Amino acid sequence: MGKGQLHPSETLWHTDAHTGARVRQVTSAACIHHHPFFFVPAHDQAMRYTFFVSHRSGQPQIYAELRASGQLLQLTDHPHLVPWSLHPTHDGRHLLFTTQSGAHRLDMETLQEEVLVAFEQQPNQVEGMVGAAMGTTTLSGDDRTWAIPVRHGGRSHMLFIDLQQQTTHEAFDNTII
């Protein structure tokens, strides 16, 4: 398995016993899979891709289901991916995510990655699985500003990246976000 590898569709259909509703299961590998954080879209606006994280390689990596064919495309191959950080751009041109070493933008056509910001040192994450501790990021509705929780010097900050101007600034110097 590796970045750019295309896997056959794993779609399974089930019928809910109580409602009779048809339910589509996107993945069937025997491992952990999860969607992005609850306020992060799992699709681009054109619904070309369904984005999810799979641990099928033994560590979390980002995949996209190609909606037209159902095939699964592995998008990342990073040993220190922050699994809750993924955020697709609304236009579907890019996928944004972080690793312990930086903030990345992946071109969905070429699968070329660009490091937008290199983290000079690994940000200290807050203990737990809530808020900034999960590394969840968010993107403005116009696909211009990406917000990333970071921690350094024992303090929490929000890093804002202007994706058009390629500039950054930090805000919120607190003990926790």
Please place each PLM-identified region on the residue numbering.
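Repetitive beta-architecture junctions, highlighting loop-to-beta-strand starts
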Residues: 21, 60-62, 70, 101-103, ...
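General structural concept
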Residues: 41-42, 47-51, 79, 86
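Asp/Glu-centered strand-loop micro-motifs enriched in Gly/Pro and often flanked by an aromatic residue
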Residues: 25-39
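Signature of short aromatic-glycine-proline-rich micro-motifs recurring in repeat-based ectodomains
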Residues: 35-45, 129-137
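Short, solvent-exposed coil/turn segments
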Residues: 19-21, 36, 68, 132, ...
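Asp-box/WD-like beta-propeller blade repeats and closely related beta-sheet repeat scaffolds
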Residues: 75-89, 93-177
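Blade/loop signatures of beta-propeller domains
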Residues: 1-24, 157
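Beta-propeller domains
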Residues: 15-19, 49-77
